[in-house]
Amino acid sequence: MNKLFLILLLIFSHEVFSQTSAEVLQSKLNAIQTMTANFSQIVKAKNHEVSRSSGSMALQRPGRFRWQTKDPLEQLIVADGQKMWIYDVDLEQVTVKNQEKGLGGTAALFLSGYDETLTHDFDVSEKQKGKLTVFDLKSKSAKENFQRIKLIFSQSALIGLELYDQLGQITDVKLVQIKSNPKLPAKLFQFKPPKGVDVVKQ
């Protein structure tokens, strides 16, 4: 869940690609300044399902994000461009991080303005799969948290992601009820800890 939030924030925070397939991908991402959707997510390891979750998300470029998991456990992640709050409802705990610290690695560089980082760290290719366009990002370094990322588009809409991490886990995300470039209220990307919860600063 956190992994997906971080990678989406990473994707929608940079600006410039230099390779042909990357240029096409960047054009699609640049066209999405705001977005809302419902998601379903399955995490697998060695062909076995590890977890399943669902909820809703909203984003506003650059760097603002809301990721709310409703099932099976309620969790809310909010990023406002500077800070990131992770609210675990069942634990009655909020973790607060500087956004770049929370992202770490490549994402932090993107947010800091190192626009060429993605082409330094990933090889980007694309292919058609029926009516879908799949962009395949492969890490150039074994140290990256995500060794491979697939972004799946139906025309201009991002409808799915597949994330492959260092441990061999695959996170498969489907997005539905997608709205591109709606006007979003600022309060979506603001967070005030509820009374009585523990607040942990990192």
Curated annotation (Swiss-Prot):
Compartment(s) where it occurs, according to its Swiss-Prot or TrEMBL record: Periplasm
Domain of life: Bacteria
Keywords: Chaperone, Periplasm, Protein transport, Signal, Transport
Gene3D superfamilies in alphabetical order: Lipoprotein localisation LolA/LolB/LppX
Family matches, as InterPro entries: LolA/LolB/LppX, OM_lipoprot_carrier_LolA-like, OM_lipoprot_carrier_LolA_Pbac
GO CC terms in record: outer membrane-bounded periplasmic space
Span of the signal peptide: 1-18
Self-association state and partner proteins as the record states: Monomer.
Family: Belongs to the LolA family.
Function (record text): Participates in the translocation of lipoproteins from the inner membrane to the outer membrane. Only forms a complex with a lipoprotein if the residue after the N-terminal Cys is not an aspartate (The Asp acts as a targeting signal to indicate that the lipoprotein should stay in the inner membrane).
Protein name, entry field: Outer-membrane lipoprotein carrier protein
